[in-house]
A protein has these predicted regions:
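Bacterial N-terminal signal peptides that target proteins for export
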Residues: 1-11
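Bacterial N-terminal signal peptides
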Residues: 12-20
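Generic alpha-helical structural signal
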Residues: 20-21, 113
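Sec/Tat signal peptide C-region and signal peptidase I cleavage site
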Residues: 22-26
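Central antiparallel beta-sheet cores of small beta-barrel/beta-sandwich binding domains
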Residues: 27-130
Length: 130
């Protein structure tokens, strides 16, 4: 009986060691894609809800996912701050009437929606050298 218990204990220990030293069942976290590079000068054509179109300019500085820079529109100018997450961008103007731009980056072009005080419109932008 004692011999049986010893064999059983050794077998259990052996199985535990084999399973414990095998490949980990925990999955590795997915590799994060780096954010798109949006640093530079952009010209924005904003289509407001009333059907008007205005041209705006933004110069973006990028540090990883963080964005800062300068915004110039037809009636106001000021700083910007925002983020970029892979192909998605969000930035806000630091102006009297704060504008929030959200969009998708596609190389040297971006497009999306913007808003101010509950009113929303669409925008398209392209990299430039103004």
């Amino acid at each position: 009986m004692r011999n049986y218990q010893l064999r059983s204990s050794l077998l259990s220990l052996f199985l535990l060691l084999c399973v414990g030293s095998g490949p980990s069942l925990a999955q590795e976290p997915p590799v994060q894609q780096p954010p798109d590079n949006v640093e530079g000068k952009w010209i924005i054509h904003a289509h407001d809800p009333d059907g008007g179109v205005s041209t705006k300019y933004v110069e973006i500085k990028q540090n990883g996912m963080q964005l800062t820079g300068h915004f110039k529109g037809p009636h106001q100018s000021g700083g910007i701050e925002g983020t970029v997450n892979v192909h998605h961008i969000v930035f806000r103007t630091k102006t009297r009437d704060v504008l929030t731009f959200r969009g998708r980056i596609q190389g040297d072009k971006m497009s999306g929606n913007f808003g101010n005080r509950g009113r929303h419109g669409t925008w398209v932008a392209e990299r430039t050298s103004f």
